[in-house]
Swiss-Prot record:
Protein name per its UniProtKB record: Serine hydroxymethyltransferase
Catalytic activity: (6R)-5,10-methylene-5,6,7,8-tetrahydrofolate + glycine + H2O = (6S)-5,6,7,8-tetrahydrofolate + L-serine
Species, as recorded: Thermus thermophilus (strain ATCC 27634 / DSM 579 / HB8)
Enzyme superclass (EC): transferase
Record's keyword terms, sorted: Amino-acid biosynthesis, Cytoplasm, One-carbon metabolism, Pyridoxal phosphate, Transferase
InterPro entries noted in UniProt: PyrdxlP-dep_Trfase, PyrdxlP-dep_Trfase_major, PyrdxlP-dep_Trfase_small, Ser_HO-MeTrfase, Ser_HO-MeTrfase-like, Ser_HO-MeTrfase_PLP_BS, SHMT-like_dom
Length: 407
C-alpha cells in the first residue's frame, strides 16, 4: 500500500528551491543556523511515528521504552552542557517554554517585568500583542539613550515601584553581555523570580564565551537552534528541582500534549555536538566574525548600535546612509544576502519599516567563514546597499557562498 503512494513532486520541488536559496546565499539572520546531517537524520527518523504523552517512566502510552531512553539522554546532556540540576526538553518552542514558566510562577494579572521590544526584547517578554502582554500586567525596562546599554538603575527603580512577580533578563536584539548577578540582586530585593531567556546566546554560554545565567536565575529558558545549532525547539533549565516539578506540570498536561520525540532526538544530538571541543572553536569564530564584520561596516560609515558586540549579533543604524531597514533588507535579499529589518533603540520609524537591520554570524560561521573574510562580506553588503542590486553582484555573492558548502 505505502509503495504505491505517488511522490509529492510539487512539495519536493519547493524544498529543492529552498535548498538552492540557502546554498547560494549568505545567511546573516542572527536567529538562523545550519544543523548537522546527524541532527537532520534524527529529526527525520521513525521517532516521528511515536506518541509519548508524559515523561520518561511515566507515560500515558505503551511502547515508550526506547523513547524514554532518547528523552532521558537529551535531558542528561542538557544538564551537563549548562551545569543545571533539572531540565525539560519537551517545549515545542522558546515561546512555549516561556509560557510554561510564567504560568508556573505567576497567576493571570500578576506583574511581569521584561525588556521593551523596542529596546531589543522579545515578544514574550511583555509585548501587548503577545500572550505575555495579555495575561499579565507588564512593566518594561530599556536602555540608556547615551550608551544604548541596559539601564540597571532604571531596572531597579521600576522593580521597587511595581514589585513584579517575575523579572525576565534576555533579548532578541541586544549585542552586549548581561549582568545576571545584578539582576538577581534586584529580583531578591523585591521578592521576584529571575527568569533568563538565553535563546539567542545559549550556544555561547555552552562554549564558555558568555556569562552562564544558571548560578543566578531561578529558571532559564532557551531555544535549541540559533547559536546552539540544533533543531527548532525549546528548553527549560533550573537548579531548583522543586520549581522544575511545577514547570513539568505546566508543559504537560498544561500547555502541550504529546512531545515531538523526533525533535527531542535532534536536540540530544545538538547537545552532544555542543559538548565537543570543536564547538568551542566554532563559537569563538562566531563571536570573532561578528566583531570583525561590525568593525568593517563601521569603517565604511555605518553606525553600529552600542559601538560593537560581545556576542553573535549586532544592530546597524542606517540613518547616516539615508536608508530604512525595510529598504536595506530588500536590497540585500535581491543579491542573496539575508538579514532582517530591526528597530534600533528609540527608533522613530514604525516596526514594519525600522531604521536598522540586525546581522548575525552563526550561519555563515557554520559554513566555514573566518574573520579574514569579513571585509569582503562587508564590502558586498555596502555595495548592495549603496549601488543597489545587480546581476553581477548577485553572482559574486553566489560564488562566495558556493565556496563554503552547507553541512
Amino acid at each position: 500500500m505505502v509503495s504505491t503512494l505517488k511522490r509529492d513532486e510539487a512539495l519536493f520541488e519547493l524544498i529543492a528551491l529552498e535548498e538552492k536559496r540557502q546554498r547560494e546565499g549568505l545567511e546573516l539572520i542572527a536567529s538562523e543556523n545550519f544543523v548537522s546531517k546527524q541532527v537532520r537524520e534524527a529529526v527525520g527518523s521513525v521517532l516521528t511515528n511515536k506518541y509519548a504523552e508524559g515523561y520518561p517512566g511515566a507515560r500515558y502510552y505503551g511502547g515508550c521504552e526506547v523513547i524514554d531512553r532518547v528523552e532521558s539522554l537529551a535531558i542528561e546532556r542538557a544538564k551537563a552542557l549548562f551545569g543545571a540540576a533539572w531540565a525539560n526538553v519537551q517545549p515545542h518552542s522558546g515561546s512555549q517554554a516561556n509560557m510554561a514558566v510564567y504560568m508556573a510562577l505567576m497567576e493571570p494579572g500578576d506583574t511581569l517585568m521584561g525588556m521593551d521590544l523596542a529596546a531589543g526584547g522579545h515578544l514574550t517578554h511583555g509585548s501587548r500583542v503577545n500572550f505575555s502582554g495579555k495575561l499579565y500586567k507588564v512593566v518594561s525596562y530599556g536602555v540608556r539613550p547615551d550608551t544604548e546599554l541596559i539601564d540597571l538603575e532604571e531596572v531597579r527603580r521600576l522593580a521597587l515601584e511595581h514589585r513584579p512577580k517575575v523579572i525576565v533578563a534576555g533579548a532578541s536584539a541586544y549585542p552586549r553581555f548581561w549582568d545576571f548577578k545584578a539582576f538577581r540582586e534586584i529580583a531578591d530585593e523585591v521578592g521576584a523570580y529571575l527568569v533568563v531567556d538565553m535563546a539567542h546566546f545559549a550556544g555561547l554560554v555552552a562554549a564558555g564565551l558568555h556569562p552562564n545565567p544558571l548560578p543566578y536565575a531561578h529558571v532559564v529558558t532557551s531555544t535549541t537552534h540559533k547559536t546552539l545549532r540544533g533543531p527548532r525547539g525549546g528548553l527549560i533549565l533550573s537548579n531548583d528541582p522543586e520549581l522544575g516539578k511545577r514547570i513539568d506540570k505546566l508543559i504537560f498536561p498544561g500547555i502541550q500534549g504529546g512531545p515531538l520525540e523526533h525533535v527531542i532526538a535532534g536536540k540530544a544530538v545538538a547537545f552532544f555536538e555542543a559538548l565537543q571541543p570543536e564547538f568551542k572553536e566554532y563559537s569563538r569564530l562566531v563571536v570573532e566574525n561578528a566583531k570583525r564584520l561590525a568593525e568593517e561596516l563601521a569603517r565604511r560609515g555605518y553606525r553600529i548600535v552600542t559601538g560593537g558586540t560581545d556576542n553573535h549579533l549586532f544592530l546597524v543604524d542606517l540613518r547616516p546612509k539615508g536608508l530604512t531597514g525595510k529598504e536595506a533588507e530588500e536590497r540585500l535579499d535581491a543579491v542573496g544576502i539575508t538579514v532582517n529589518k530591526n528597530a534600533i533603540p528609540f527608533d522613530p520609524k514604525p516596526p514594519r519599516v525600522t531604521s536598522g537591520i540586525r546581522i548575525g554570524t552563526p550561519a555563515i560561521t557554520t559554513r566555514g567563514f573566518t574573520p579574514e573574510e569579513m571585509p569582503l562580506v562587508a564590502e558586498l553588503i555596502d555595495r548592495a546597499l549603496l549601488e543597489g542590486p545587480s546581476e553581477a553582484l548577485r553572482e559574486e555573492v553566489r560564488r562566495l557562498a558556493l565556496a563554503h558548502p552547507m553541512p
